[in-house]
Swiss-Prot record:
Species annotation: Drosophila melanogaster (Fruit fly)
A GO molecular-function descriptor: receptor ligand activity
S-S bridge residues: 274-285, 322-330, 332-349, 397-411, 399-406, 478-497, 486-492, 496-538, 512-529, 514-526, 521-522
Biased composition (Basic residues): 449-460
Signal peptide: 1-21
Function: Binds as a ligand to a family of frizzled seven-transmembrane receptors and acts through a cascade of genes on the nucleus. Acts downstream of homeotic complex genes in the visceral mesoderm and is required for embryonic segmentation. Also required for cell movement and FAK regulation during ovarian morphogenesis.
Cellular compartments per GO CC: cell surface; extracellular region; extracellular space
Protein name (database record): Protein Wnt-4
Gene: Wnt4
Length: 539
């Protein structure tokens, strides 16, 4: 076993091969002095060695990017161990994650714990020369050519956005925000690989976000899907086509060929009705609050609303698609049976609300479980959206008889227009309740109700999913109201946050003085009139 003052050799994995996770190793030797320091006796030699390391690292970066762009690379974990295992390369199965990294640099001595990349140290003044160079103890130091501390602030540190293009994920509470990242949940932008613990994974899939399961907090699937609904535009790669999806969601889209188109319809319903409901409010369904912060950073009242609206739109679209024959694994809803007192016959094709609820809960992963407070509230708010669709079910009837009489009537169950559901959820948004952190979780409330002794039900039980909950007070959204149109001057006073507004006079041309031609039915003739209209815009 080498002593602390011995010679350290760092083996760097330089080439990730195609195929089934096979790796070709190309070793690089970094010369170290007897005391563990870089040999700096000859400055010219030291400078030449440093340039060689830089050129070699650039070659590695170019080769990795080339392989990742092909989209065929297996997810392989890059890893270097310390101590007795210094200089070794440890491989794991594709997507196996970074749990193989069993030590982080924590030395506080003047000697770097690892020289030439690998794991750095907070307490020492050295930068890692080559490699990822992840510092220990909370990202204390940057690295020279790799993932540096403080979001790569070192002049030679690669930007996080660049690493995102390599498909690197930092999961959960250990994560850092990236191009599409939020709340330290994920760092994404290119191919996606597996990750575990505090490790880094390099992925192979550059066409869609086919993510490893279990790498994020419980509420991530729902949060990711809702965010995709309000940010995705056009088609994306993957079986779900119209929105980035997890591996399990992509599997659902493969099994049900009608689901991708139905999800696209749900996205259209959610975004258009959200914008209509908040057209003249400071928040107009934009995910941004100010700068690059978005409403998914914390659980605001707006976050609760978009989760409820997305779940409602998915339930509505799937239930309607079943009844219209656009789904392969469902059809009309269950038939109703007539009672003696009814003066009509149940018939027609009911909207399949039951199937819509089931698929929505599965796609958003709303299954029960012991989750954290945010998970439980997001799950509850999504259920509020599903319940809103259920409450808008109505009877649709058609009369049959001679000469338009209604001697016989056939009825079926049909959902109301989605505008009614969106209006109901907007009302629930206005009445939403902020939940104090020390209150019981939603699951505890549900469990306490379930423990009550069973009683014979005399009337339909009232749903518990009637109120939206949130945790954080919403920001002002004043930073995103510039140039927004107001409804009237009084509305500008609120919408423009006191910055004032400008008035534009717009000429409108519209039909007027309409009449029947020569007094006969039914040819209508109209004149065209000009009308001046004031429009108001925030400064």
């Amino acid at each position: 076993m080498p002593s602390p003052t011995g010679v350290f050799v760092l083996m760097i994995l330089t080439h990730l091969s195609f195929g089934l996770g096979q790796v070709r190793n190309e070793d690089q030797l970094l010369m170290v002095g007897q005391n563990g320091d870089l040999d700096s006796s000859n400055p010219a030699i030291h400078h030449q060695q440093h340039q060689q390391h830089q050129q070699h690292q650039q070659h590695q970066q170019h080769q990795s990017n080339h392989n990742l762009n092909n989209g065929n690379m297996n997810s392989t974990i890059l890893n270097t161990l310390m101590g007795n295992n210094a200089g070794q390369v440890v491989n794991s199965s594709p997507g196996g994650g970074g749990s193989m990294i069993n030590q982080l640099g924590s030395s506080t001595s003047s000697v770097p714990s690892v020289i030439g990349g690998g794991v750095g140290s907070v307490g020492n003044p050295w930068h890692s020369a080559v490699g990822l160079g992840v510092p220990g103890n909370g990202m204390g130091l940057p690295s020279s050519h790799g993932l540096g501390g403080n979001m790569g602030s070192h002049p030679h540190g690669h930007a996080l956005a660049g690493l995102a293009k390599l498909g690197i994920i930092v999961p959960g509470g250990q994560g850092l925000p990236g191009n599409l990242g939020y709340g330290g949940t994920m760092l994404n932008g290119g191919g996606v690989g597996g990750a575990a613990g505090m490790g880094l994974g390099i992925g192979s899939n550059t066409n869609n976000m086919d993510m490893q399961q279990g790498l994020y907090n419980e509420h991530f699937i729902s949060e990711h899907t809702v965010m995709a609904v309000f940010t995705s535009q056009g088609q994306v790669g993957g079986p779900c086509r119209y929105m980035p999806a997890t591996r399990r969601q992509n599997h659902q889209c493969r099994k049900e060929t009608g689901l991708p188109g139905t999800l696209s319809e749900a996205r259209r319903l959610a975004t258009t009705h959200c914008e209509e409901q908040f057209r003249y409010d400071r928040w107009n369904c934009s995910i941004e609050t100010r700068g690059k912060r978005n409403i998914f950073k914390k659980l605001y009242k707006e976050t609760a609303f978009v989760h409820a609206l997305t779940a409602a739109a998915m339930t509505h679209s799937i239930a309607r698609a079943c009844a219209e024959g656009r789904m392969t694994k469902c059809s009309c809803g269950p038939k109703k049976h007539n009672r003696e007192a009814q003066d009509f016959q149940w018939g027609g094709c009911n909207d399949n609300l039951k199937h819509g609820k089931r698929v929505t809960r599965s796609f958003l992963d709303l299954r029960g479980g012991d989750g954290d407070e945010v998970s439980e509230i997001l799950r509850h708010d999504s259920e509020v959206g599903i319940e809103a669709v259920s409450s808008q079910m109505m009877d649709k009837c058609k009369c049959h008889g001679v000469s338009g009489s209604c001697s016989m009537k056939t009825c079926w169950k049909k959902m109301a227009d989605f505008n009614a559901t969106a209006t109901l959820l907007r009302q629930k948004y206005n009445e939403a309740i902020r939940k104090a952190p020390n209150q019981r979780s939603m699951r505890q409330v549900s469990s306490s109700r379930m423990k009550k002794p069973k009683q014979r039900r005399k009337k339909p039980q009232q749903s518990q999913y009637t109120t939206l909950y949130y945790l954080e007070t919403s920001p002002s959204y004043c930073a995103v109201t510039k140039d927004r149109q107001c409804l009237h001057p009084d509305n500008c006073g609120t919408l423009c946050c006191g910055r004032g507004y400008t008035t534009q006079v717009v000429k409108q041309v519209e039909k007027c003085r309409c009449r029947f031609n020569n007094g006969r039915c039914c040819q209508l003739i109209c004149d065209y009139c000009q009308r001046l209209e004031n429009k108001y815009f925030c400064k």
